[in-house]
Amino acid sequence: MFRGSPRHSRIFFSSDIVLLARRMTHKVAALYQFAALPDFSDLRAPLLELCAAHGIRGTLLLSPEGINGTIAGLEDGIDAVIAELTTGALFAGRLNNLELKFSTASAMPFKRLKVRLKKEIVTLLQPQVDPTRQVGTYVAAEDWNALISDPDVIVVDTRNRFEVKMGTFERALDPETRKFSQFPDFVSRTLNPDKNKKIAMFCTGGIRCEKASAYLLAEGFAEVFHLKGGILKYLETIPPEQSLWQGECFVFDERVALGHGLVERALAEDESEGETP
């Protein structure tokens, strides 16, 4: 009388595994900090070893001015790596102000692990600019709407043009750059420290607009603001009904773009299937 039971049990078990696999997520950490790392080349091997030991993939950049990158893995692995970066012996307290944004991915968004050595963690090609010494005023996501709604504030998107096409803030100027090192040319053509008294800048995770703020201050601009944590922090913090963001935020991994709540585009589309407008 139990002849049919094993077959039914196997079917239930198999479908349960498929459902579980679909629901498994990877934790993604976007991180950066401008910090003096004169020994950056010596940090590459132990950082690779640390990430590999916890099954982490992604890309991290090390330079004399700090660290930048995005990594992904299971939650325990990401948490262990972040703990070592911020409080462990490897960086000896030099990354205790690490800027972090966490999101999830329905599948591993990176194929491999890379730790690269660079002259700059974000390339501006302006050696006189030192964000470890001087940057603009950080603006929290909760205060961003009020700032960029001020008609006296010039809002600047510091990202490249293909990113801007996917989404940006209302009133934002598009520098139409192909790479960040072209941003100073945009400034010299478009902005004037004598006329443009207040500049508010933003980028994906905060690193480009932070370095851009240091550049503008060096060029004589007096009131320079930048979105702390970038667009990702804004989308994580601000509900859609209060948002001034238009479109999606491009990210440099296989998820391609994120929306409010840092939901990846494909997942958002799947969840909306069958809904009436």
Regions flagged by a language model, labelled:
Residues 2-5, 17-18:
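Coiled-coil-like amphipathic alpha-helices with heptad-repeat character
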Residues 7, 11-14, 163:
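General helical structural elements
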Residues 12-23:
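Short, Lys/Arg-enriched N-terminal segments with co-localized hydrophobic residues
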Residues 21-137, 159-200, 207-277:
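Rhodanese-like catalytic fold shared by cysteine-dependent sulfurtransferases
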Residues 142-163:
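Internal active-site segments that recognize and position negatively charged phosphoryl groups
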